[in-house]
Amino acid sequence: MSTNEGSLWGGRFADGPADALAALSKSTHFDWVLAPYDIAASKAHARVLFSAGLLTEDQRDGLLAGLDSLASDVADGSFAPLVTDEDVHGALERGLIDRVGAELGGRLRAGRSRNDQVATLFRAWLRDAIRRVADGVLGVVSALATQAAAHPTAIMPGKTHLQSAQPVLLAHHLLAHAHPLLRDVDRLADFDKRAAVSPYGAGALAGSSLGLDPDAIAAELGFDSAADNSIDATAARDFAAEAAFVLAMIGVDLSRLAEDIILWSTTEFGYVTLHDAWSTGSSIMPQKKNPDIAELARGKSGRLIGNLTGLLATLKAQPLAYNRDLQEDKEPVFDSVAQLELLLPAVAGLVSTLSFDVDRMAELAPLGYTLATDVAEWLVRRGVPFRVAHEAAGAAVRAAEARGVGLEDLEDAELTGIHPELTGDVREVLTIEGSVNSRDARGGTAPVQVAKQLNVVRDTADRLRLRLRT
């Protein structure tokens, strides 16, 4: 049997828990990251206890000095959990009592429960973690924008269904990956509005009768407000699920970018060469240069999705208020943050060092009759209904395929035989440069529009950086 030494509960029990239960309950192996937040909250709690008349000035100052000493020892690693500590809260109370004595140290627990404590600490940790992740995402956006700026006129095959579709600018394609990542950062910034509500003062579920001031603690800990409902405050983990979703969405967006890089780096595509520092080799095949970062990004997206779905499954059928199931709420979120903090700098480095073969992309851009839409739209500009123009352009593709030539190589007689308006003048649009230049509406792939898109991406990233700092 465990002795229950150092536990925050036990007066009602004659003996400690069974060893198997103690092992099952233990959480210091993952919740110790909350220790600095726990100490900061304890300092705020000591001040509120003093304001409520529950501590003398000397007692408050003694607790604050003990907590400062404990914080220093936690930071340098000289204080750490013992095998007998159940969780971060119990370990830190033990550390405080070691420094100020049981009589004074035991006063700090008045008016608070692990239920409101951990809900507050989780929110505080996550608010900081989200900012770190957002910075990493913006690093990837910056790498994409830099590559786009370096290739303002490079043309590549645009694809749908992974089949050649229409010519587009490489910069246009790269910025198409930047936009969803910017939306992810916007979601992270918006998430803070809901995370910045402090559960502190809710107690186990019913609030406190000791005259404590939840708003004062909320303000000291950097929250926007205290919770309006103590039951909801201790039981709610929708903030964690929301964060897990955005983290998973980042993983999905990175995975799509990674998939493009994986394809582009193959011999068959040949669009990019990977930098030696951001790729790996094979243990048996000397020629290999493998896109490991991109493949790990693709693989880790599944892990992030799993963390989200696992958390939602944990939350789905819990009655109000707090249940011990919620011990399982933190590890998936902690893991998602940790994985992205590893992954994002690597993806940014990979993207920033890609070497593009722009000649190869330009050579492939017209293949697969990617200018057929330009033929149809040229006919529309001459007054032909689009339905008819679409049929005529398709017939031109069939004729070119039958001869094994490009659309621009069809004879004038062949063109007019398909449709009387389809004359040799159509060749003026049958270049990849003419195709991309013609698509100059907002959002299009014309160079003038893509230059505007690049400015939008950079301006949006700057605004989001500023928003995340406030």
UniProtKB/Swiss-Prot annotation:
EC code: 4.3.2.1
Keywords: Amino-acid biosynthesis, Arginine biosynthesis, Cytoplasm, Lyase
SUPFAM superfamilies per the UniProt record, alphabetical: L-aspartase-like
Cross-referenced Pfam families: ASL_C2, Lyase_1
One biological process term in Gene Ontology: L-arginine biosynthetic process
GO MF annotation terms: argininosuccinate lyase activity
Top EC class of this enzyme: lyase
Cell compartment(s), UniProt: Cytoplasm
Catalyzed chemical reaction(s): 2-(N(omega)-L-arginino)succinate = fumarate + L-arginine
Keyword Iron-sulfur: no
InterPro entries, sorted: Arg_succ_lyase_C, Argininosuccinate_lyase, Fumarase/histidase_N, Fumarate_lyase_CS, Fumarate_lyase_fam, Fumarate_lyase_N, L-Aspartase-like
GO cellular component, one term: cytosol
Pathway note: Amino-acid biosynthesis; L-arginine biosynthesis; L-arginine from L-ornithine and carbamoyl phosphate: step 3/3
Segments crossing the lipid bilayer: none
UniProt similarity note: Belongs to the lyase 1 family. Argininosuccinate lyase subfamily.
Protein name (record): Argininosuccinate lyase
Species classification: Bacteria, Bacillati, Actinomycetota, Actinomycetes, Mycobacteriales
